[in-house]
Amino acid sequence: MNIKELYYYHDLVRTKNFSQVASDFNISQPTVTMAIKRLEESFGTTFFMRDRSHHQLTVTSTGLQFDQHVQRIIEELEIAQKELARAKQECISFGLPPIIGSWYFPRFTPALLQAGLLNQLEVVDHGSASLLQLLAKGELDLALLGSLQPFQQPSLRARVIDKAPIRIIVAKDHPLAAFEDGVSFAQAAQYPFITLDDEYIHAQAFCQAAHLARVRPKIVFKTSDVQILKALVANHSGISFLTDLALDDNDGLVALPLTDGSQPEFIISLAARANRLLTPNAQRLWSILETPLYK
């Protein structure tokens, strides 16, 4: 079986037109016809039904089933090409979400600098959901990811390296700031919220907390910028729901624990594709990031 034939096959399933496939790959139509014939003979089945009188091509049920396998093969081949190309380079494609990158990752920089790895990092800055997709596509060597639960995907090699609570955030002179021992989410929901947008896992945590408390808090503003969110909260434009990992002493904010039974946590995990063979530099980066000594 020729790998190119799989590409022809998948394109034919997509277009249902031999001439179009030939044009897409700049080959002759008989080349496409013979490739499909060889595949059908190899598997002893018919993948396409040809209605020559109406010039129609129909994909059989076995043809559709085979195409599912073909798509996975093509996807893995493309991932392998990306990973092998990067293996020849010294740089490490490293996913880093905004909050983790700004308030958690810097504690590792002395060790990375000493190991000569800091200048090898090619940082990709996106939310954890986007970075997870890039990992799956083989476009990242590894990443630090935020989540509400530990990752369980078989396709992912993941290790929880830290956790931080998600709390109600208010200005220092806000009425809720007096409740140092904490507030319920229902109590906090009496005030308008400023939240992070759906790129952050905080949006999911917010919805879960509201559902458990059986309340519908008013959201007056959503943002993708943590600094803007904190400034608006400090300016009494609303309160927020944020990991205290993202707070600084000079923010003028107070983090209040939730008194509800279930309190969400911001879980930080180190992750790579399960079948990804890390380069020596990427493996050294992994070892540093997973070592408690460097927290």
Question: For the regions a protein language model found, what residue spans apply to each?
Answer:
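Hydrophobic hinge/microswitch elements
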Residues: 127-131, 136-140, 146, 201-256
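Alpha-helical linker/hinge and terminal dimerization helices associated
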Residues: 42-43, 66-87
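A short LG(V/I)-centered, amphipathic sequence patch enriched
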Residues: 40-59
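Central regulatory/effector-binding core of bacterial HTH transcription factors
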Residues: 89-152, 222-223
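Secondary-structure junction motif
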Residues: 183, 191-213, 278-286
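Flexible hinge/capping segments at coil-to-helix
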Residues: 155-193
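Short helix-boundary/capping micro-motifs
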Residues: 12-28
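Beta-alpha-beta core module
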Residues: 152-159, 164, 227-277
